[in-house]
Amino acid sequence: MTSAYELVSDYQPAGDQPQAIKTLNEGLENGLAHQTLLGVTGSGKTFTLANVIAKSGRPTVIMAHNKTLAAQLYGEMKAFFPNNAVEYFVSYFDYYQPEAYVPTTDTFIEKDSSVNEHIEQMRLSATKALLERKDAIIIASVSAIYGLGDPQAYLSMMLHLSRGDIINQRDILRRLAELQYKRNDMAFERGTFRVRGEVLDVFPAESEHEAIRIELFDDEVERISKFDPLTGSIITKDMPRCTIYPKTHYVTPREKVLDAIEQIKVDLAERKKELLANNKLVEEQRISQRTQFDIEMMNELGFCSGIENYSRYLSGRPQGEAPPTLFDYLPKDGLLIIDESHITVSQIGAMYKGDRSRKENLVEYGFRLPSALDNRPMRFDEFEARAPQTIYVSATPGKYEIEKSGSDIAEQLVRPTGLLDPIIEVRPVGTQVDDLLSEIRIRTKVGERVLVTTLTKRMSEDLTEYLAEHGVKVRYLHSDIDTVERVEIIRDLRLGKFDVLVGINLLREGLDMPEVSLVAILDADKEGFLRSERSLIQAIGRAARNLEGKAILYADRITGSMEKAIGETERRREKQILHNEALGIVPTALKKNVADILELGDMTKNKRKIVAPKMKLSEVAEEGASYQSMTPQQLEKEVQRLEAKMYQHARDLEFEQAAKVRDEVEKLRNQFITNS
């Protein structure tokens, strides 16, 4: 069977990669529900996964435990599959304050949120790709387990038009209004339509650069074409048909809304009786007033503020049933890959409990009907039941993944570059600080970097101060530092602006720094979460991308976790040495551009190239640097400002300037994903 995917890479699988790819693909073909890819740091796990996806030819969801890792994966997969649908599905809130009630102070906090339009467009594009294409790869965060609109209602609301259809223009306009598109004959933006005589232009909600033009002759669809909404130039002429998707995942047919209102009225009457029976008069009045207002809004407008709390009625689900999520859009033969599974799996399980306790307060005190409890993320058992065939990916898989996979674990211990796992030394705690200082001096002389991990914030601060007093260029990475600043600190370490980075639990997953040749773990014998076998292996792995990689564990005794971590690292190192000797491989240093950790690859590869006037290199560099230091909120404001400028240029028929500004907006949007 020919795969729908086209993998583009200058490399061929090497080291343990061919065997891992073969094992995982055979497992998928044999119908294995759970497999694990145990891949050491720097062994090219992403490339292995790209090969597995390409060979299997299945639509795939890759889940990451945070937006930073999701953005990194998105960039890498975009580079591997430039001609396929690689999409990004993370939470679209720039800011989110859920509604809550604090009984002790009698304080009700209204829901407040700010939705990022670009991420919303990418989410719509992701579900569209899953519904339309076999070659869809969706990079998602844990927000994938939260409720999304019912796919059946979403599909039933789509507007299909074919050349030669007999349909009245007013009927098309009514259908577009039902899909929550707005008419705007002045500013043509995403999620709007405009009418000029018998020509109807629609800017689809999931599209970035393409709009649809429907030309009618009387009541017949005469021509359908695709055009650039900015310049007006035709992209595809005379299309046989087109499909317009709803503006939001939560769109619902009018009949369903009316049915839901009737059911809400019945449940409201029951809840009022219940509250009165318990002598809760204030709560009874509160639930009555709030729900009646919502019913009125739904009746008049088709939606209301907080309509997600009535999602059970709108999707026709029985009480307690799991909400529809991204997994309901994934075809039956879909594939799920969970990256850094030892963290992501536990995150999936934790989401439900926190949401539940907040909602129970709202229901108990009459702010919401009990149906609000069904607007929630999936429980872990529901996630397990809905998840398709799954591959867990980690250098240190958790108990859950190992139990589920059993013997179906593909090991990727050998790196294509021949690099070995670090040498591990155990040294006494008594002299750890002075010993560390002398080790730092040895490394900095040859231009290498050092990571130091401590147990407490206080110790990190004191150590940073001590090292700085002794002339070491050192920085401290702590939990108060936001994602953007964190990325900048890592970049500065790689560039050599400082030599030593001190932290607590921040030097683990997803940090690729080939310049780091030494990882020092202070108080390694203090058994606990930060010094568990998994944490130690992850920290040791940070030195695995350097030819001179070494890890020093400062401890007065060997704990169980240390013994396991040292044993596992030595087992891997032994296998790597044997492999190198057998094939005559000489380990080579990993070359990774410093820019790689800040950029998402060429996301605009397949988009129109517009030649802009030459700029001075210094100007370009300054511009890029200023974008990197912006917060997501600042970037969003800048995008809005530039978009307004772009549309003004288009209205003034200055298409070259408009296209130039559009390229700038594209850069900002890519940076937004990294910075968020």
Swiss-Prot record:
This is UvrABC system protein B. The lineage of its organism: Bacteria, Pseudomonadati, Pseudomonadota, Gammaproteobacteria, Vibrionales. One of its GO terms (biological process) is nucleotide-excision repair. It is found in: Cytoplasm. Forms a heterotetramer with UvrA during the search for lesions. Interacts with UvrC in an incision complex. Signal peptide: none annotated. The UvrABC repair system catalyzes the recognition and processing of DNA lesions. A damage recognition complex composed of 2 UvrA and 2 UvrB subunits scans DNA for abnormalities. Upon binding of the UvrA(2)B(2) complex to a putative damaged site, the DNA wraps around one UvrB monomer. DNA wrap is dependent on ATP binding by UvrB and probably causes local melting of the DNA helix, facilitating insertion of UvrB beta-hairpin between the DNA strands. Then UvrB probes one DNA strand for the presence of a lesion. A motif (Beta-hairpin) lies at residues 92-115. The keyword Iron-sulfur does not apply. It comes from the Bacteria. Residues 432-594 form the Helicase C-terminal domain. Its main location: cytoplasm. The gene is uvrB. Belongs to the UvrB family. GO terms for cellular component: cytoplasm; excinuclease repair complex. Residues 636-671 form the UVR domain. Coiled coil: none annotated. NCBIfam families: PRK05298.1, uvrb. The beta-hairpin motif is involved in DNA binding. Residues 26-183 form the Helicase ATP-binding domain. Keywords: ATP-binding, Cytoplasm, DNA damage, DNA excision, DNA repair, Excision nuclease, Helicase, Hydrolase, Nucleotide-binding, SOS response. SUPFAM superfamilies: C-terminal UvrC-binding domain of UvrB, P-loop containing nucleoside triphosphate hydrolases.
